[in-house]
Structures are given as structure tokens and as C-alpha cells.
A protein has these predicted regions:
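N-terminal alpha-helical interaction blocks
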Residues: 1-11, 67-105
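Short, non-ligating residues that shape and space the ligands of small metal-coordination modules
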Residues: 30-33, 55-57, 129-134, 151-152
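Short Cys/His-rich Zn2+-coordinating modules
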Residues: 1-12, 24-35, 98-109, 121-129
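Charged, low-complexity interaction segments
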Residues: 83, 87, 91, 104-119, ...
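Residues immediately within or flanking Cys/His clusters that coordinate Zn2+
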Residues: 17-20, 44, 116-121, 128, ...
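Short cysteine-rich clusters marking metal-coordination/redox-active sites
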Residues: 23-26, 47-50, 122-125, 142-145
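Short linker/helix segments within small regulatory modules
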Residues: 35-44, 132-141
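Short metal-binding segments enriched for Cys and/or His
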Residues: 49-68, 75-84, 148-153
């Protein structure tokens, strides 16, 4: 079986159009402009807290929903195969029966979470991002280019 299945997960934006992300290195949460994912001028996202670039900034909610969707899909495939086998052996010498006891996971859409974050306009890229208030005071890295920004003009 070489089929590839694609699942779509909608990630909500807040009132400022920001999407919640989580750094896999320092586990810090931050938000970036939701339009950045379709923008070719931004090649990589930097964590505002540690400044490191990662391949994936998936939050725990998105990961959990993706796992539930893929598990439901896999179990549906298995169930279809066993039901097909049950029908194929219905009138033969060797019979097969299948009763599923699998409970599907509910695939609830991701809800917008409330985080205590402040909007920072990075002058290097002229783009907004939301970071924790402490990072605004201590300084943070621009998520779009990685330049250190201390909040002082």
C-alpha cells in the first residue's frame, strides 16, 4: 500500500491575525502573523525566546488532533478490510467474522487559546508578533529574520 493520505487541520488566529506556535527547543509559546505561511519572503521562523530555527513549531493541541485523525483513519481502513474478508468468506468452508470494539476519537476543531502575550512590532522586518511580556522587557529575537531586538528604538 503506497497511498498517501493528507489531513487538513485548521488552526485559528486571534483578533490580530496571529497564530500560536510552540518552540520544540525551549517549549516557549509565541505567535506570528498568520499570513507568513503563504509568504515567500520568510524562509524560516526563529523562536523569539531562544532564537533557534526549527522545522516544526506545532503546538500540543495540533499534534494531538493530528494523531487522533490518523488513528481514526487507520482503524477505518482496518475495519473495511476485515468486513471485506467477512463478506468474502460468507459462503465458504472457512468463515470469518469481525466485530469492532474500537471507539473513534472525537476530532474536535482546535479552539483559540487565551495566552498572556503582548504585541511587538519588529522594526527589522516591520511585522508584528506576540511574545510573553517578560520577553518584551528583556529582549527577543525577531521570528521572521532572527535579529535580536531589545525594544529600544
Amino acid at each position: 500500500m503506497s497511498e498517501t493520505e493528507v489531513f487538513t487541520i485548521s488552526i485559528p488566529t486571534d483578533e490580530d491575525g496571529q497564530v500560536l506556535l510552540k518552540c520544540p527547543v525551549c517549549n516557549d509559546l509565541f505567535k506570528v502573523d498568520g499570513t507568513v505561511f503563504g509568504d515567500d519572503s520568510v524562509f524560516e521562523i526563529h523562536c523569539p525566546s531562544c532564537g533557534i530555527v526549527s522545522d516544526s513549531y506545532i503546538t500540543d493541541d495540533v499534534l494531538k488532533l493530528g494523531m487522533q485523525m490518523s488513528e481514526n483513519y487507520a482503524n477505518d481502513l482496518i475495519e473495511k478490510k476485515f468486513k471485506k474478508l467477512e463478506k468474502a468468506t460468507k459462503n465458504s468452508f472457512l468463515k470469518s467474522s469481525y466485530k469492532s470494539n474500537y471507539k473513534r476519537h472525537s476530532e474536535q476543531p482546535i479552539k483559540l487559546s487565551v495566552e498572556n502575550m503582548t504585541l511587538v512590532e519588529y522594526p527589522c522586518c516591520k511585522r508584528p508578533s506576540k511574545v510573553k511580556p517578560l520577553l518584551r522587557l528583556c529582549g527577543s529575537y525577531c521570528p521572521y529574520c532572527g535579529e535580536k531586538y531589545y525594544g529600544i528604538e
